[in-house]
Design a protein with these regions (language model features):
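Generic enzyme active-site microenvironment
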Residues: 17, 21, 55, 155
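Short glycine-enriched, charge-decorated loop/helix-capping segments at active-site entrances
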Residues: 28-34, 70-76
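Short aromatic-enriched loop/helix-cap "lid" or pocket-rim segments at secondary-structure transitions
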Residues: 65-69, 167
Length: 182
């Protein structure tokens, strides 16, 4: 699918950076570096105009069902180095962080309160979603915003999937793919 150029109004647009954490980025290997750089470019543009930025952080505790029920190896443990944001995309003081314990950045999180605090409104504002894991967490974020009546977009240069065959096909069915950052 060809990208769509969309002009963004920083006052009515939020940048959501999903799961750009050490552990996940290491799993994706060197191919993630251009994605990190492209997200950083968007982040710098939003920061330069005092834009609305939300960092989403996936964290777990040792009693999480992923480990206790499904037997997965421990990962993204709260407070562990792997759960930290990658250095290039670390939040600055005052930038919002939403911690989540599932693929969904809305389920049992502060996302709704953060959107209200930033005065981002459904049926009016656009959300630009970036990150890795487009077949999981980015996908669920886009769907979460979509079902809440936000216009959600994924810059095709600023997300990727662990299973490359899923990138970007899963998101293109639901949202416009931006060809430019802003």
């Amino acid at each position: 699918m060809a990208g769509t150029k969309i002009e963004l109004d920083v006052q009515s647009t939020g940048l959501v950076i999903v799961d750009m954490q050490v552990e996940g980025c290491e799993r994706h290997g060197p191919g993630v570096k251009p994605v990190i750089a492209n997200i950083r470019g968007l982040l710098d543009r939003f920061r330069a105009v005092n834009g609305k930025i939300i960092h989403v952080q996936s964290v777990r505790t040792k009693d999480h069902p992923e480990f206790t029920v499904f037997g997965r190896p421990y990962g993204l443990l709260l407070g562990s180095p792997g759960a930290d944001f990658v250095e290039e995309l670390r939040p600055l003081a005052g930038e919002e962080i939403v911690q989540k314990t599932s693929h969904d950045c809305f389920y049992k999180t502060s996302m709704e309160a953060v959107l209200e605090k930033l005065q981002l409104q459904a049926c009016r504002d656009r959300i630009v979603v970036t990150g890795i894991g487009s077949s999981n967490c980015v996908y669920h974020a886009v769907i979460g915003f979509h079902i809440r009546n936000y216009t959600a977009s994924c810059p095709k240069i600023a997300f990727m999937a662990f299973i490359l065959s899923h990138n970007p096909s899963r998101c293109t069915n639901f949202v416009p793919m931006l060809t430019t950052s802003m």
